[in-house]
Amino acid sequence: MDEAMNGPDADVVIVGGGPAGMMAGLLFARAGARALVLEKHADFFRDFRGDTVHPSTMELLDQLGLLERFLARPHNRINHAAVVWNGRTFRIGDLTHLDTPAPFIAMMPQWDFLAFLKDEAAAFPGFRLAMKAEVTGLIEEAGRVTGVTLADGRLLRAGALTVMADGRGSLVRCQGLLPLKGLGAPIDVFWFRVPRTLQSGPQPGNALRGVVSGRTILALIDRETYWQCAWVFEKGQAEAVRARGIAAFRAEIERAAPDLGDLSAVLPDFDAVSLLSVSLDRLTSWHRPGLLAIGDAAHAMSPVGGIGINLAVQDAVAAANALAGPMAAGEPLDPLLFRVQDRRMLPTRVIQGAQKAAHDFVLGPIASGRRETASEAPAMLRLFDRVALLRRLPARMIGYGFRRERLTAPAATGGR
């Protein structure tokens, strides 16, 4: 990484070391490119980031010959989903019937998943990862992005492409470099953990459980030793919730999910709770000459369905499929960038449409108090619970998403 003008620092400079950026770095390096990933933090450790690795992502790992090593890392598995509606449980999803090497959701802390990708990518000679490398600007020459500037003043030049995979706070968003369409989100989420004990808590079952009771909406994810819990509330009301006090917050959770037990030791104050400000938006153009946005930088997703990581990985695969071969052949990439957006925009719009419908017609009205939870569960929940075959439909959408990618990008020498 030299400022000298005697050549590019990498063929592809990737801004952001999240799932999209790390997977893109691995795939471009696998194809023989010099791929430089820039991550602004000193490590990958962030609590309450997406921890769900879905079957579509594990299919890709299987294609790469990495699935066995991935599953050797500590994780737990989710293969069923249910909703508890005013105290009655309805089964709504069953992943065990998916025809895939890993018919379950692997729950793994995101920092472990990223460390795994880093270790596997390091087997390719063209891969480099720079931590504490904060990008503050883009280098543009003759109307084309040719690299980035770092907070310490260094200039890093990309020989072929700059990929923005720097999340919903992306430089291209903050500086208005690509057009953004907001879809609105009427909810925010508080995350917290409840340790599992022998005396209390839902019975283990490798399940994702939603709870709807009165105005309370909870999601509980089985993490074996604890429950990862999400409490949904009206957008922008975090301070109002805090002002009511932690005792009132605990009481609402305990009423909705009494099997979690007494939460006074688990939630002594709001320091034990993390806020997720929910966004739902997308760029209407993901590229400009020399630059491509993928992952959350291109589309911020709601936590509904827990599919953000997997969409980001699918974007990285689509980018490598469309661009890695031409990059290796020395072809200009600018005329090809539209292919990535064309491939990935429809899945983005379909999934965001489903999330927006969930926001506008279920989560938002209940969380805001505009609508009380009906005493009887919706007919669709009752139907899924009665007909086991139907439970495969939501499982398929959650497990595979829409238009999942198959890896076609070339592989050069290297790797394990």
Predicted segments, located by residue:
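Beta1/beta-strand and adjacent pyrophosphate-binding region of the FAD-binding site
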Residues: 6-18
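N-terminal Rossmann-fold NAD(P) dinucleotide-binding loop
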Residues: 21-22
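Short FAD-binding loop at a beta-strand-to-alpha-helix junction that anchors the flavin cofactor
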Residues: 287-303
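Glycine-rich FAD pyrophosphate-binding loop
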Residues: 29-49
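Conserved N-terminal glycine-rich FAD pyrophosphate-binding loop of Rossmann-like flavoproteins
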Residues: 42-62
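Conserved FAD-binding catalytic core of PHBH/FMO-like flavoproteins
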Residues: 143-155, 160-278, 282, 287
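Conserved N-terminal helical subregion
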Residues: 2-9, 59, 63-175, 183-193, ...
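C-terminal helical "tail/cap" subdomain of flavin- and related membrane-associated enzymes
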Residues: 4-5, 321-416
